[in-house]
């Protein structure tokens, strides 16, 4: 499984990329691999304010449906409608296929997430 440096990871297998006050959120390579071929993606409304642990969206595959959670408090600025039109983009490039771009409400919440080396260890225990 690919784990990229420079991202933050949640125990629910979401990744967070920080750029200034904005974050990009998606699901990890492990998550997409576990789900299999993704056939449907549901995203939140632009303007939604979500707290850490809230459902950000839904990803469905031929095997299962899975909620995607926001690992940090956010206000959704943009959604990636390309994923709605072609959900398989997540399978092909999970780290390039962000689900939302959002305003990060509390940067200190990033400290509760894992960095790449911690996430790799976490995956070994899964």
UniProtKB/Swiss-Prot annotation:
Pfam families: GCV_H. The keyword Protease does not apply. Binds 1 lipoyl cofactor covalently. One of its GO terms (biological process) is glycine decarboxylation via glycine cleavage system. This is Glycine cleavage system H protein 2. The glycine cleavage system catalyzes the degradation of glycine. The H protein shuttles the methylamine group of glycine from the P protein to the T protein. Its cofactor is (R)-lipoate. PROSITE patterns: BIOTINYL_LIPOYL. The lineage of its organism: Bacteria, Bacillati, Bacillota, Clostridia, Thermoanaerobacterales. Belongs to the GcvH family. The gene is gcvH2.
């Amino acid at each position: 499984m690919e784990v990229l440096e420079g991202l933050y990871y949640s125990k629910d297998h979401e990744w967070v990329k920080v750029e200034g006050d904005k974050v990009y959120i998606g699901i990890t390579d492990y998550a997409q691999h576990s789900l299999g071929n993704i056939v449907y993606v549901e995203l939140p409304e632009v303007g939604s304010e979500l707290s850490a642990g809230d459902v950000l969206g839904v990803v469905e595959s031929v095997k299962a449906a899975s909620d995607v959670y926001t690992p940090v408090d956010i206000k959704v600025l943009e959604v990636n409608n390309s994923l709605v039109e072609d959900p398989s983009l997540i399978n092909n490039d999970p780290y390039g296929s962000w689900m939302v771009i959002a305003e990060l409400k509390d940067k200190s919440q990033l400290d509760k997430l894992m960095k790449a080396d911690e996430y790799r260890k976490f995956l070994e225990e899964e």
